[in-house]
């Protein structure tokens, strides 16, 4: 009968491991503690790219958080304005180099009405151009001996006419196109007829209105060119601009009236 092999305690060839002895157990080399003065063969490398990426991500997160906070404050401001006054506040975005008004035809005007709105916008820019050039022409006439009073009157026309035309007829048309409001369309037609009448009078420039030479109409141009050729040329250019603005305004009025009748 075979017996299981029992270790011989008196056998010197076998190594006895006493678990209770100090340091008696075999410890793998990888898990042994590093003694004082012992050098490490392996070094830990931390790539700089990862550090740069993490800093960039932190900056992006900070920028994103700031932008979200700004939008949240803007939305809160609008909600407070609507709740208090019932009026929606639009961000100023035009002109791009110095925003003073909100203007976004592509996003706020229906697609089928955008062409008409662009035509009306061209008409408004046209009257601004006419009034600004009118100031330049009267300044040339003043330099050539025409008197300073006509220059000051032309400056007043420009300072009042440019914002007034926007408030009285262009902005109401813009809102009428957005909301399809018959009341706003009616106000636009009334004020736009006054605008057309002013353009026609300015193109003629009778001496009984606006102190004669303060507008670059045809009668004023004929009178000025006899005294100064250069000033007369400027006046005739201004006369042509007022004529083009009058024709464009009549065309815009016809187009918008047909659009209004077609929608109603």
Curated annotation (Swiss-Prot):
Superkingdom classification of source: Eukaryota
Recorded topology in the membrane: Multi-pass membrane protein
Side of membrane Cytoplasmic, spans: 1-122, 254-264
TM stretches of this protein: 123-143, 150-170, 185-205, 233-253
Residue runs in coiled coils: 51-85
Principal localisation: membrane
Any GO CC annotation of this UniProt entry: transport vesicle membrane
GO process terms (BP): protein transport
Region of interest (Disordered), residue spans: 1-33
Location(s), subcellular: Cell membrane; Cytoplasmic vesicle, Secretory vesicle membrane
Family: Belongs to the SCAMP family.
UniProt protein name: Secretory carrier-associated membrane protein 4
């Amino acid at each position: 009968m075979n017996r299981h092999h029992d270790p011989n305690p008196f056998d010197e060839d076998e190594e006895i491991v006493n678990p209770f002895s100090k340091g008696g157990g075999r410890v793998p080399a990888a898990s042994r503690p590093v003694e004082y003065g012992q050098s490490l063969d392996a070094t830990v490398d931390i790539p700089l790219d990862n550090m740069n990426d993490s800093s960039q991500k932190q900056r992006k997160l900070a920028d994103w958080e700031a932008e979200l906070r700004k939008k949240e404050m803007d939305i809160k401001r609008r909600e407070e304005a609507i709740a208090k006054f019932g009026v929606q506040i639009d961000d100023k975005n035009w002109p791009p180099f110095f925003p003073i008004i909100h203007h976004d035809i592509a996003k706020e005007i229906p697609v089928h009405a955008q062409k008409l709105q662009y035509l009306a916008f061209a008409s408004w820019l046209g009257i601004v151009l006419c009034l600004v050039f009118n100031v330049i022409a009267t300044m040339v006439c003043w330099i050539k001996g025409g008197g300073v009073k006509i220059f000051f009157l032309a400056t007043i026309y420009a300072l009042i006419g440019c914002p007034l035309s926007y408030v009285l007829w262009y902005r109401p048309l813009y809102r009428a196109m957005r909301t399809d409001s018959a009341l706003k369309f009616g106000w636009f037609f009334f004020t736009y007829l006054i605008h057309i009448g002013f353009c026609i009078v300015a193109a003629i420039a009778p001496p009984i209105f606006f102190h004669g030479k303060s507008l670059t109409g045809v009668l004023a141009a004929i009178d000025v060119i006899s005294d100064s050729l250069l000033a007369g040329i400027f006046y005739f250019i201004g006369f042509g601009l007022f004529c083009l603005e009058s024709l464009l305004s009549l065309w815009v009025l016809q187009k918008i009236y047909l659009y209004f009748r077609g929608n109603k």
